[in-house]
Structures are given as C-alpha cells and as structure tokens.
C-alpha cells in the first residue's frame, strides 16, 4: 500500500513508468526467478508488461511476415489468432479447422500430450509448459531436445511459462533457460496472474537474452524498440505490487495460494477418475484434461456440460 500512498502526494507521485520496466522489479525477477535457479538472465533482459496474453500476442510483431509458425495441437488460441491477424497463416480449412501455413504438432495420449519435433522446419515455435490446456509437462531432457533443435535449425522458441509456479516434480524445469544453449534461441514469457492472482491488475514479463537473433537481427534491441514505441509502461503501483511478490511474506502467500488451487485440481481429478473418466494433468498444473466419453467431440461435451449438467 506504500506505493498507493506515494501516488497520493505530489512530491512522491510517479508519472509514466520506464517503458521497459522499473529496475527494482526487473532485478527482483532476475534474482529470484532466474539466477536463484542457475539461469544466466540479467535484469536488463527482462521487459515488464501488462499481461502475458498481450506479450504472447505482440511478440510476433518483431518477426517477418513470411515466418512460419509451429504450434501444439490443442493450443492456447492467442498464439494462432494473432498470427492470423498478422497475415502469416495462409488460408483456412473450415472442415479441418487448420491454417495452410501453420505447422501443427499433435499432442495426444500416445505422446503424453507433449509435442514431437516437427517434420517441416518452422521459424517460430510456440511451447507452453506446464501446458494450457492439457496440464502436461516435459522434463529438462525433453526440453533440451527442443533447444538443440531450435539452435540447429535457426528457429526461435516462444516459451510460455505462465504456470511454472505449479510445478511440483523435480525433473520438470521452471524455465527454458535451465537448458544449455537456450540464450541463443528462446524467448520466455512470465505471468503474475497465475501465481499471484494479478488477473484484474495485469503484470507480466518477457525475457529476451541479448544473445538471441532471428537471421542477423538482434531480437533484444528490436523488442525494446517495439515495446518503447507502443507501450508507456506498467504503472508504478502495479510494479511495486509485483516486487512484493518476492518478499518473504509474498512467497509464503503465493505458496499457500498455489496449494489451494492444486488441491482443487486434485479433488476434480479424483472425482472424475472415481466416476470412470480417463483424465490427466493436475500434477504440475491446475488443469485437468479429460477424454470425452462415448466418442463425443469436445464441443458436444462442452454443450452437454452447459445444458444438462449446468456447469
């Protein structure tokens, strides 16, 4: 509340925030989220924004229009839809529900809902772990395979780590920068909504190491230019709240909140399993992924829940 009090007085009022983020929050993130886990990420490689959804949607603007994207299937819609809006995805096949210039990487029960390396080489690879919507994760060894692949092919990985606070298994990495070589191929996006409940407050970060290029272009400086051109910075009050997340009290409260959501997921998962459904997830993410019964499509099951079960 100290930041609110500061903003209430002319002598301590803060105007436009630094467009790339206040140093106090960038340093807190670098220290706690990365350096504490052995990741070589510095404060000036972290860009503060007002929501991971915005960052996931806006990051494609610094890439060429003819860049080809690869996405998991199923996928968080923002990755595809913003590229559609940018004119990058080709023509739409309504019957198949796919775009001609998008590489789809199936995530099925047979692959433990994790993607396999695509046969066609993409320019941009969207990965989200723990995954929205399936709740699946990959081990550090599996993620290293993707980093090696991206460095070999020249692709850039957009790594959505919004749900990293829910990871409970030691073999599951909290950041792609735990993998060797990730600084030269990966951009990571973090959210304060999923761990700290900033849903109506809005705060996020995009991490772009100074080593990463697309072709001959340094993406760190390009994103800094784009960010400064289109964004006037997240408010001082919100960024001070973000800094408080890394205090001892903040960490304790976050741990309790994550445990609450994971217990909800446990109750849902166990209830569905007891009812005879095949389900996964709920271990490193608050998502439960359910196999629809009797050959129903996802939309049929959704309508059934809405109209018959009142869910």
Annotate each predicted stretch with a short phrase.
Residues 1-51, 245-249, 266:
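N-terminal small-domain helix-loop-helix segment of the aminotransferase-like
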Residues 243, 258-269, 278-292, 298:
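Conserved glycine-rich beta-strand-loop-beta hairpin in the small C-terminal domain of fold type I
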Residues 67, 152-155, 183-184:
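A short helix->loop->beta-strand "cap" motif at the edges of active sites that frequently abuts
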Residues 84, 178-259, 266-270:
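Conserved core segment of the aminotransferase class I/II
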Residues 62-83:
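Conserved PLP-anchoring active-site segment centered on the Schiff-base-forming lysine
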Residues 22-25, 42-67, 199-204:
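Conserved beta-loop-alpha segment that forms the PLP phosphate-binding cup at the N-terminus of a helix
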Residues 93-174:
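Active-site phosphate-binding strand-loop segment of PLP-dependent enzymes
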């Amino acid at each position: 509340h100290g930041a609110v009090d500061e903003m209430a007085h002319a002598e301590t009022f803060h105007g436009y925030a630094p467009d790339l983020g206040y140093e106090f929050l960038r340093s807190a993130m670098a220290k706690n989220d990365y350096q504490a886990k052995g990741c070589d990420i510095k404060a000036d490689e972290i860009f503060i924004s007002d929501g991971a959804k915005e960052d996931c949607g806006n990051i494609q603007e610094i890439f060429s229009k003819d860049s080809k994207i690869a996405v998991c299937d199923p996928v968080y819609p923002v990755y595809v839809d913003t590229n559609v809006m940018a004119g990058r995805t080709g023509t739409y096949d309504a019957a198949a529900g796919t775009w001609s210039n998008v590489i789809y990487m199936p995530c099925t029960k047979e692959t433990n809902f994790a993607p396999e390396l695509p046969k066609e080489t993409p320019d941009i690879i969207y990965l989200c772990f723990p995954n929205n919507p399936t709740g699946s994760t990959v081990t550090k060894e599996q993620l290293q395979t993707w980093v090696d692949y991206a460095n070999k092919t020249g692709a850039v990985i957009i790594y959505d780590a919004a749900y990293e606070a829910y990871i409970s298994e030691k073999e599951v990495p909290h950041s792609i920068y735990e993998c060797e070589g990730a600084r030269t191929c990966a951009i990571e996006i973090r959210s304060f909504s999923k761990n700290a409940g900033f849903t109506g407050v809005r705060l996020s970060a995009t991490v772009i190491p100074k080593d990463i290029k697309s072709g001959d272009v340094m993406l760190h400086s390009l994103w800094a230019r784009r960010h400064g051109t289109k964004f006037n910075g997240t408010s001082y009050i919100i960024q001070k709240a973000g800094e408080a997340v890394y205090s001892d009290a903040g960490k304790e409260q976050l741990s309790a909140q994550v445990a609450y959501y994971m217990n909800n997921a446990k109750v849902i998962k166990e209830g569905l399993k007891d009812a005879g459904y095949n389900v996964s997830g709920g271990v490193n993410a608050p998502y439960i992924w359910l196999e629809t019964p009797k050959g129903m499509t996802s939309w049929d099951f959704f309508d059934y829940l809405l109209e018959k079960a009142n869910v």
